[in-house]
From Swiss-Prot:
Family the entry assigns: Belongs to the asfivirus M1249L family.
Protein known as: Minor capsid protein M1249L
Species name: African swine fever virus (strain Badajoz 1971 Vero-adapted) (Ba71V)
Quaternary state and interactors: Interacts with the minor capsid protein p17 and with the hexon capsid protein p72 capsomers; these interactions form a rigid zipper structure that stabilizes the capsomers. Interacts with host IRF3.
Principal subcellular localisation of the protein: virion
GO cellular component: host cell cytoplasm; virion component
């Protein structure tokens, strides 16, 4: 390989590199750096371009010198990072003279400072007399290159005029010593300082041009113009002489020097594998194949012949590909017509035959099989139908109706306002109005115009409906559902039954191993980003009222993928402080992008920071956000010792660039008044508190609303009006539910003290310290809110004080994060579950829930106080139904009173806790006592109630459950029979102990069934026919172990009938029946499961909650007397017990498979029965042929022949190798990627993480 002339050698002025020591190397690097830094000609040029050419210099010195300064990273990795990340700039450290890499600043990235230069689309360019035009580049292309910093305005002018190429060639020729060239035929660079700077500047400009795609244009244009014009040497030389005016050199020598330069340039890119996939593949390929001879001999016949032959081959390949595509399309259309005309069964049978013969894509073979199976008339019918369809395609292709342009605008537009206008124009052309079952046809041409689901989708998008709403409304068009599984869970896709377009999809995550409500990191980090974004709303000024939930949801969708894309963020059990810090950085970068977008696009909603002007500079916003971030999240930052302010600033800058690159400019939508009103009600603390109280006292269900009807019922119960009634009278909301008071947020920070009070609720709630106590904490917070209600004027100052407390609380929480580690066996997953938790008691006074009599509070009395002291009366107490009648805007809600003990809500802490505990214990004792004697009588036997009183013991029926209405009767009866109760309780305990110590008796003879059983072989035959298997396979359930599957299928080698009740076959078949019955009962009673099994949930996912409840009524009970009969036969006749279990399995299967009504259940039960019985048989197959894997479980088509595969060679199932005859097919493979250059960033993505 020829030695490459590099700029490093130029700057060194001829010094022998091999003779340099370490100090001289450092001095040389300093000299290069200072030369670039001090040159005015290259002031605005990024150092990446110049230092890039030091590759050969550094590699050469590293190979020859053994004591080099240690570089911060390997050279190959350094070059790779330069290519992959154009925003990384190498610098030379002033202290250690090492090559380092740091992120570039915005000033270095955007060099043009917003300047745009208009360039004609066909600017003339002249190179060696060849008058070319820039047809390959448009002005937009040049503008884009200028925007990303590839060119300065001056450079852009060079590109447009071609001066960068011609000037560079001139300077290159000036820098070549003429005498040396004539002697050796090689160029030696002249070492004057002016030539160095000029050469360097021109080289960098040319390199940028080539790197941006100019190499492709350069070679194509030179080759094309020279071949077509067929210039001879004299003409070419005359043109060159006109360009090179400064020196009298032979034209032929000039061309040789250009070839020398191009060869050297291509050689530089071929030194390392990194550059073979870089920016010069075309130039390198031309040089390697000898095509640069075009510059030397324009009429080279070999080049022309090769180009002509290659073009012919490409045309032939295109024709073959088009013909193949047409044939395959015709074959597929044949099958579609067959399904419609002669039936699905016959079509599948023909498809199976042709698939085995390898002719499934041959239309002629399809017609021949149709003639064999159905007759010649059916084949002619298929051919005629296909010709009609093809003619329809041709007519549609030639159609020039005006609706085509409108549909194209509709499907490619971005602004919903414009799309609605286009949609209105399209609706005018509808042949039928209000069509939702088929294509909307054009009344002008008669062809398909628009699918109804697209019409509805455009309307929903214009109304800014949520994804869930759109998916729900579009489901009525769904007719094709597909399901597949990936690492995230099951993906369900829904397709339109009219046009086949995808409507929606969602992921049902596999949560069988999750612990708690939120068990995976994705949900935790998503919630963290959502919560922190909502907190950021406190300092953001939106200008108008916006949907803050939409703001947070967009932030999650934007930031979450970017956080996960960071290399050192791993999806572990729980996210660490570093992950939280990255999430906060991207949240604030998203906020900065919103501010930046509102400044750039005036149509967007104006977004700024409270206290800052809307036209403030971007640097001011960056400074504020960085300071806010470091102040607000100092608790997180303090946990990371290696994090500095500069690190945060650098990552914030990179996050902002990534968000701009990925999302561009972003804006937010403004809410309407109706939505704002309902949102304020539902999210307000009053509604939340009222709904919580209503759930506690049983007015509404404990669970959240699951249907619109349940949501409307909850709203009406809590508010007193339906949403429609409330919206019609907004003044009603203003009068009753608007208060001038605000809560004292400083007191909320002191809620931490509640955790450490003496009395605990954990004793009374059986250890449920999360769900119940969280509700009590809310009630405690409301008590504080009422207690400090009068501090409304100091609200703003106290809010600021609360924010300072929040930081300290975060630090305290970080210190408490040193949690214990536990390995707990999880019975759901069958493996150890790793948890970290403090198991810390959350303590609240018991009087928050119960009064001094042990009764739960009922907060049903509302206490209103007059806003004005002159108003009479000063205080009003009303029930919920009287609020509308008696309360106006002169009164504000002040407190709640318990209707049981008449204590005010904020005074529950003053109740005597000892009395509450004593009353609760007494209540527990009474409950146990009266539950014990609910049916039995202390006098013996059962109660004999006459006129609601037992004539034997004197117990009244109304005191069994109500212990407070008649306390004297309750205590008298309790005192009379307490001793008797204690004796009977001890007697029961002693009997239980005696039972535990007694040796169990031997198994008694089981009772015979009520009806005798006789074996019916017809059930097995019928089941086998439905499953398309041999009856012998069903008979072999429980007896496949150790047998060849071929023998099982033929009924050979079956073991003799069992003779013992302990035969393992009986237990195996009985287990299969029990599994079938268990899964069936899960399906029948699916409405009772909080989380049903996945295979059952998949079957009923489309049913409503009411339909799931009806499954228990419409599905039959198939158990009957199975267990009784099996137990009896197992002891008396084991052989009959085996046959009975197998027959019962088939009878249960047929009972479910043959269900005819109701229609909405048929498909569910049939799919369940087929899946369950096939699973049992497939599981049994795995036990056949011990010592070898049974390929038959994948179906008979997988195995090469129907013979016994126990002795098959494993090589029959392995893929073709890379040696011998296998390599022949590989050479002819047109899809091989062996010779394709793969970009290094792709290789990085393929590397193991």
């Amino acid at each position: 390989m020829e030695e490459v002339i590099t700029i490093a050698q130029i700057v060194h002025r001829g010094t022998d590199i091999l003779s340099l020591n370490n100090e001289e190397i450092e001095a040389l690097v300093d000299e290069i750096y200072s030369t670039l830094k001090g040159s005015n000609d290259i002031k605005n040029i990024r150092l990446i371009d110049f230092l890039f050419t030091l590759k050969d210099f550094v590699n050469h010195v590293r190979a020859e010198q053994s004591k080099l300064p240690d570089l911060s990273m390997p050279m190959e990795a350094y070059i790779r990072q330069l290519l992959v990340d154009p925003d990384v700039v190498p610098i030379v450290s002033e202290k250690k003279k090492e090559l380092r890499v740091r992120p570039s600043t915005r000033k270095e990235i955007f060099l043009i400072n917003g300047t745009h230069l208009a360039v004609p689309a066909e600017a003339p360019i002249e190179i060696y007399g060849l008058k070319l035009r820039l047809k390959s580049f448009s002005p937009q292309c040049f503008m884009r290159m200028a925007e990303i910093g590839s060119f300065s305005p001056e450079t852009l002018g060079y590109v447009a005029s071609g001066a960068n190429l011609t000037n560079f060639i001139r300077v290159f020729m000036k820098c070549v010593d003429q005498e040396t060239w004539k002697k050796n035929g090689e160029g030696v660079v002249v070492t004057t300082k002016e030539n160095i700077i000029q050469f360097t500047h021109q080289y960098i400009e040319l390199y940028k041009f080539l790197r941006s795609g100019g190499h492709s244009w350069l070679i194509n244009r030179l080759a094309e113009e020279m071949v077509h014009r067929k210039l001879d040497r004299e003409d070419q030389g005359s043109h060159i002489s006109n360009i090179v005016e400064t020196e009298e050199i032979e034209p032929e020598e000039n061309i040789k020097r250009v070839i020398f330069f191009l060869k050297e340039l291509s050689t530089m890119y071929s030194v390392s594998p990194v550059f073979t996939s870089g920016y010069m593949p075309l130039l390198y390929d031309l040089y390697r194949a000898g095509y640069l001879e075009v510059l030397w001999n324009p009429v080279e016949q070999k080049f022309l012949q090769h180009a002509e032959q290659r073009e012919k081959e490409q045309m032939i390949l295109q024709q073959v590909d088009m013909k193949l595509t047409e044939v395959i399309t015709q074959a597929r259309q044949y099958f579609k017509i067959m399904e419609e005309k002669i039936g699905r069964v016959q079509s599948d049978a023909i498809r199976e035959i042709l698939t085995m013969e390898g002719k499934v894509d041959d239309p002629n073979s399809i017609l021949q099989e149709v003639i064999k199976a159905c007759g010649k008339q059916e084949a002619e019918l298929i051919t005629t139908e296909y010709l009609n369809i093809k003619k329809q395609w041709e007519l549609q292709e030639k159609n020039a109706c005006a609706h085509l342009k409108l549909v194209k605008q509709l499907r490619s537009g971005l602004q919903y306002a414009e799309l609605l206008k286009v949609l209105e124009s399209i609706r005018v052309l509808y042949k039928e109005k209000n069509n939702t079952t088929n294509w909307n046809l054009c009344k002008a041409c008669g062809f398909k115009l628009l699918c109804p689901h697209v019409d509805m989708l455009i309307q929903l998008q214009a109304a800014e409906a949520s994804y869930d709403t759109m998916r729900t409304k579009l489901m009525k068009f769904s007719g094709i559902n597909k399901e597949k599984e990936n690492n995230q869970g099951l993906i369900y896709s829904y397709f339109c039954k009219i046009c086949g377009e995808e409507l929606a999809h969602f992921i049902q995550e596999d949560r069988t191993a999750d612990v708690g409500v939120i068990g995976d990191l994705n949900s935790k980090l998503r919630i963290f980003i959502w919560q922190e974004t909502m907190k950021a709303c406190t300092f953001i000024h939106f200008g108008k009222l916006v949907d803050v939930k939409q703001f947070a949801n967009i932030a999650v969708n934007v930031c979450l993928p970017l956080v996960y894309s960071i290399e050192n963020i791993k999806k572990e059990e729980d996210y660490d402080p570093l992950t939280q810090l990255y999430a906060v950085i991207y949240i604030y970068a998203y906020i900065l992008n919103l501010i930046y977008s509102s400044q750039k696009n005036k149509e967007f909603l104006t977004i700024t920071i409270h206290g800052m002007k809307a036209d403030s500079s971007l640097n001011a916003y960056v400074t504020f956000l960085l300071e806010k971030m470091m102040q607000q999240y100092s608790g997180i930052i303090n946990q990371l010792s290696e994090i500095t302010d500069q690190w945060i600033a650098n990552n914030f800058r990179e996050a902002f660039k990534k968000i701009i690159h990925q999302n561009g400019l972003q804006g937010l939508s403004v809410q309407d008044d109706t939505k704002v009103l309902l949102t304020e009600i539902l999210l307000g603390p009053m509604y939340d508190y009222a709904a919580t109280v209503a759930r506690i006292d049983g007015s509404i269900p404990m669970h959240k609303p699951r249907t619109p009807k349940e949501a409307e019922y909850e709203f009406k119960t809590v508010i007193g009006r339906t949403p429609a009634e409330l919206l019609s009278q907004k003044e009603f909301y203003d009068k009753i539910y608007t208060s001038k008071y605000r809560p004292d947020f400083t007191q909320l920070a002191r809620l931490n003290d509640i955790y450490f009070q003496e009395e605990s609720l954990r004793v009374w709630w059986g250890g449920r310290d999360e769900e119940k106590t969280s509700t009590l904490i809310y009630l405690r917070a409301y008590e504080l809110f009422l207690k400090y209600l009068q501090n409304a004027p100091n609200f703003n100052s106290e809010l600021a004080e609360f924010k300072t407390y929040e930081n300290a609380y975060g630090e305290q929480k970080a210190l408490l994060a040193q949690q214990g580690f536990y390995n707990i066996f999880d019975p759901n997953t069958g493996r150890a579950d790793q948890r970290t938790r403090l198991f810390e008691y959350k303590r609240l006074p018991i009087s928050t829930l119960y009064d001094e009599r042990g009764l739960p509070h009922k907060w049903t009395i509302y206490v209103y106080k007059a806003v004005d002291s002159s108003q009479k009366p000063a205080e009003i107490e009303v029930t919920r139904k009287d609020v509308i009648k008696k309360i106006d805007n002169h009164y504000a809600l002040a407190d709640l009173r318990c209707s049981v003990c008449h204590v005010l809500q904020h005074e529950v802490g003053q109740l005597n806790i000892k009395k509450v505990q004593t009353a609760l214990k007494a209540s527990l004792e009474f409950n146990t006592f009266y539950a014990f004697y609910e049916s039995r009588c202390p006098k013996g036997g059962l109660h004999d109630f006459q006129d609601k009183k037992c004539v034997k013991c004197g117990l009244f029926t109304y005191i069994i459950y109500d212990h407070l209405s008649q306390p004297e009767l309750v205590h008298d009866y309790y005192n009379n029979y307490k001793d008797q109760y204690d004796k009977e309780k001890m007697s029961i305990r002693s009997i239980q102990i005696k039972k535990d110590m007694t040796t169990p008796s031997s198994e008694t003879q089981p009772k015979p069934p009520q009806e005798p059983w006789t074996f019916d072989y017809g059930k097995i035959i019928k089941t086998a026919k439905i499953l398309d298997i041999s009856p012998a396979v069903i008979e072999a359930i429980g007896a496949m172990e150790g047998r060849s599957y071929a023998d099982i299928r033929e009924g050979q080698g079956a073991p003799p009938p069992p003779t013992s009740m302990d035969d393992p076959r009986l237990m195996a078949v009985d287990s299969a029946v029990r599994i079938f019955l268990y899964n069936y009962n899960c399906l029948r009673h699916v409405s009772t499961f909080n989380k049903p099994p996945m295979h059952v949930e998949r079957l009923v996912k489309h049913l409503s909650y009411e339909e799931k409840e009806d499954l228990e009524k419409v599905l039959p009970n198939v158990v009957n007397e199975y267990h009784t009969t099996f137990k009896h036969l197992r002891v008396t006749d084991p052989a009959s017990a085996l046959l009975y279990s197998i027959e019962f399995l088939c009878v249960s299967f047929l009972t479910l498979y043959e269900i005819k009504e109701p229609s909405w259940v048929v498909n569910i039960v049939r799919e369940f029965a087929l899946t369950e019985l096939n699973t049992i048989i497939q599981s049994e197959k795995l036990l056949s042929k011990p010592g070898a894997f049974n390929f038959m479980i994948f179906g008979e088509d997988f195995v090469c022949s129907g013979e016994d595969s126990s002795m098959d060679d494993i090589s029959a199932y392995s893929s073709p190798g890379l040696f011998g005859e296998d390599i022949i097919d590989r050479l002819d493979d047109p899809f091989s990627i062996e010779d394709v250059d793969i970009s290094l960033d792709v290789l990085d993505n393929l590397a193991p993480q």
